[in-house]
Design a protein with these regions (language model features):
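A short catalytic or substrate-binding loop motif that flags glycine-/basic-rich loops and adjacent residues
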Residues: 6
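Surface-exposed loop/interface segments of Gram-negative outer-membrane beta-barrel transport/assembly proteins
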Residues: 2-3, 35-39, 45-131, 147-223
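Long hydrophobic segments that form regular secondary structure
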Residues: 141-142
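Predominantly transmembrane beta-strands of Gram-negative outer membrane beta-barrel pores used
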Residues: 9-31, 35, 45-53, 62-64
Length: 223
């Protein structure tokens, strides 16, 4: 077990533009080291937005993208880890037995495991996400606009776990993945007009969306 909690945060952003165009880009990174050995988290994010007016205001183009990656090394069982650390015989060595290549343990206590054996457990997860969008606005006539919008989202979550025989009877390993993809597109035509004492506001809209989910998981033991 360690005794220092460490965390780093880094952010950077830059932007610029004019009356006809603008952009902004930002990046972020976070690194967190837990107080327990092999427990940590890393996260990276990026974001970009751009806007451009073209053809004397006839067309306005907007683009955006966001992405993130986060990786975690987790502690499987806080209770058993801290309970073992608090109750285990402190005179036992902090290394494996060179003859048996296993951790020394208390055979008469079924719920007390060598706390260093828990440090060999692997429980990792990673999440990746990306989202992009684009919007085109056409100023066709006075009061008449056409908007085209499209977006794509991709998300994947990966989990993996390894429990050696020193902490789990017969051992166990797990691997799983979940993916999600989403496509969205819409078209909107608007017309607004003042005529004498009347005001006309007409809207025509069409939209299409598709989502796909895939994944798998598997667990093995007795190794």
């Amino acid at each position: 077990l360690g005794d220092v909690y460490k965390r780093q945060n880094h952010h950077i952003a830059f932007y610029g533009g004019s009356s006809e165009s603008s952009y902004r880009v930002s990046l972020g990174f976070m690194d967190r080291q837990g107080v327990i050995l092999n427990e940590d988290m890393k996260n990276f994010t990026s974001n970009m937005n751009m806007n451009q007016k073209m053809f004397d205001g006839f067309l306005n183009c907007e683009l955006g993208m966001f992405g993130s990656i986060q990786k975690n090394h987790n502690l499987v069982d806080y209770q058993k880890t801290f309970y073992s650390a608090a109750t285990f015989n402190p005179t036992y060595p902090n290394h494996k037995d060179p003859v048996t290549n296993s951790w020394d343990g208390i055979t008469t206590a079924s719920q007390i495991t060598n706390p260093l054996a828990w440090m060999e457990v692997q429980d990792d997860d990673a999440t990746s996400h990306i989202s992009t969008h684009a919007r085109l606005t056409f100023n066709l006539l006075e009061g008449l606009k056409l908007n085209l919008f499209g977006a794509y989202t991709y998300n994947i979550v990966e989990n993996s776990q390894y429990l050696p025989t020193s902490v789990w009877a017969n051992g166990q390993a797990y691997k799983g993945t979940k993916k999600r993809e989403s496509l969205l597109g819409n078209m909107m035509l608007t017309y607004k007009k003042n005529w004498k004492k009347h005001f006309f506001d007409v809207l025509a809209l069409a939209e299409l969306q598709k989502e796909t989910y895939t994944g798998y998981y598997t667990t093995v033991s007795n190794f």
